[in-house]
Amino acid sequence: MSDFKTKIFPEPELEFGDQHHHPDPRLGLLQAGPLQTNLGDTIKVGVVGSALTVEKSGEFLNAIEDGFEGKTEKHPNLHPDFPGLRNQNPYRCRFEMVAAEDGVLTKGQIEKIAKEPSDARAVEMAVDAVMAQLEKLEAHHERPDVVMVSLPVKLIERVWRNERARDDEVIEDEAADAKAGRETSPNFRGLLKARAMDLRFSIQIVWEGHFNPD
């Protein structure tokens, strides 16, 4: 029996502006900015969500514009200072919320998804509803550069409920589940990311609790 030799390759550091390298993406951005800076003066941010989460997302962006200090002195690397969103931030540009009125999911849409008894159908309905708003932003005269999908609590509880169950137990054979008549539902996050790939901007899913602790 021959010996099997193993080797651990060092993890490459991330590259930032001015050929700066750093293992931590947050500290690297803070010290040198991105490898390629934004070509304009402003990064336009769109938001899709309920009327409340769209409003709170705008308030959150305004609140963090001037930056804030890190949480703790004991572990500064875990919670570094946040430099803010003005021109001197690491991205060398401003962040501006645009087309806020065009990304709102109606209360009726959210209620209908929340009350849908089928997990699979609820996920598909939620993705369809979000995609409709993303496509409106895509066609807007102020098309955003990035869009926050700010999910309200009611949608999070509905479309993530079955995913939490999947994390707790390994489903070895979904084909067997389908054959036995047991419903297999799609992954909301994966389905939305796949559907949004053709859009001309990036999306980031954000939970309501991140900017609306109440």
Feature roles, as predicted:
Residues 1-214:
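Long, low-complexity, intrinsically disordered terminal regions
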